Amino acid sequence: MFANSRLIYGTMGLGGGWNSDKLTPKAVEEAALAFEAALEIGIDYFDFADIYQNGKSESVFGEVLKANPEFKNIIKIQTKAGIILANKDGIGQFDFSAKHIINAAIDSLSRLNVSSIDSLLLHRPDPLMEASELKEAFKYLFENGLIKKMGVSNMNQYQIQYIEKATGFKVKSNQLQISLSKLDWLDGTIGVNNDNGYRSTFTPGLLEYMMLH
């Protein structure tokens, strides 16, 4: 039942809302039911991000684990860091600085009520990411046992190569946003049947390729 599942349960909808409201008993109950339903069908891997429901997706799951500590040795946890949600002026940003990534991971551990994250993903590409900052962040996280694997989200091969060279660690996963209307992961150069077309002749990942060479 609890063999490593090839499916991952996405928790973006758990927590009660994308706001600063506190967790409610109803949100915790709904998360517990979702958690139990996933386990019943053999899904033991759970995906989070520090921004999901303003952190409450992790917090509500942490409450479930407090009530069921025996599950900590059964499940695997994946979460993401690197995005700062838009402020009141509608301005959001990426932050792959060592300070932000380290603090984000530590905060996620606290919300999730666990001592280690099975896989920490950099949440979408940050065009301003710097090799020294990435190296410092992941060196600290691995050496202190706070994470077990490193991954990325929605990145191309050159971005992955850049991160691997910068950190000295292998990228173990790349979470992609895939749908019938989201196909840039498949073909980033030919806008077939696309009314908007692709205006740029630059291959995605050119910046990272140049930084590597």
Stretches found by the model and what they are:
Residues 1-76, 143:
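N-terminal binding-site loop/beta-alpha segment at the start of enzyme catalytic domains
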Residues 9, 38, 46, 61, ...:
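Conserved, mostly hydrophobic/aromatic
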Residues 72-98, 123-124:
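Structural motif corresponding to the early beta-alpha repeats
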